Amino acid sequence: MPKGLLGKKVGMTQIFTDTGLAVPVTVIEAGPCIVVQKKTPEKDGYSAIQLGFGAKKERSFNKPMLGHFLAARVRPLRYLREVRVENPETYQVGQEIKADIFAPGEKVDVVGTTKGRGFAGGIKRHGFHRGPMAHGSKYHRRPGSLGAKGPARVFKGRRLPGHLGMERVTVQNLEVVKVDADRNLLAVKGAVPGPKGGLVLIKQAAKARG
């Protein structure tokens, strides 16, 4: 059954296997999440549950959002995200979901927002080559030609300098190495997008392999 959990990236470390191999892992504070709403095919056209995560002061919410939490009889939560499930009937509004829904060895997809890098040039943003660095060169790190003379315009999608980062990125098929159910911590093999403290969504792998 598809499952998911909201969490917060804690940072990276390494875990040693029984054979002494160092495995790089990202530690995620996964949950506890609360089911705030259920979506059913009869009413909404698809099956999903809405999860809430993180504390936030009540005065920071507007009245529509407070009413949404009041209808579910749950405390106000900082983040709300939907997770597709096959049988929303198996969940109850107000139910708490913890990190123990995942087990070591399981494959997961992790969705996060990459670090914002601000305005970046073509070399950093797209991996362009530099121009000649010789004394007579007229350009060194500039983007170069924008296209042919004939169309007399720049085509859509042309790779140019601009804002880098702050994009939603999904990393697929990360292995769950360790689960600490008491502290709601997950250790997944490899890197996860985003800064420390960034919000991540951990889902059952859509294309799990091996």
UniProtKB/Swiss-Prot annotation:
Superkingdom, taxonomy of origin: Bacteria
GO molecular function, a single term: structural constituent of ribosome
Keyword RNA-binding in record: yes
Pfam families (alphabetical): Ribosomal_L3
GO annotation, cellular component aspect: cytosolic large ribosomal subunit
Region (Disordered): 121-150
Gene Ontology terms: biological process: translation
InterPro entries named among the record's database cross-references: Ribosomal_uL3 (IPR000597), Ribosomal_uL3_bac/org-type (IPR019927), Ribosomal_uL3_CS (IPR019926), Transl_B-barrel_sf (IPR009000)
Keywords: Ribonucleoprotein, Ribosomal protein, RNA-binding, rRNA-binding
Family label: Belongs to the universal ribosomal protein uL3 family.
NCBIfam families for this protein: L3_bact
Entry function: One of the primary rRNA binding proteins, it binds directly near the 3'-end of the 23S rRNA, where it nucleates assembly of the 50S subunit.
Subunit record text: Part of the 50S ribosomal subunit. Forms a cluster with proteins L14 and L19.
Name this polypeptide is given: Large ribosomal subunit protein uL3
Chain's gene name: rplC
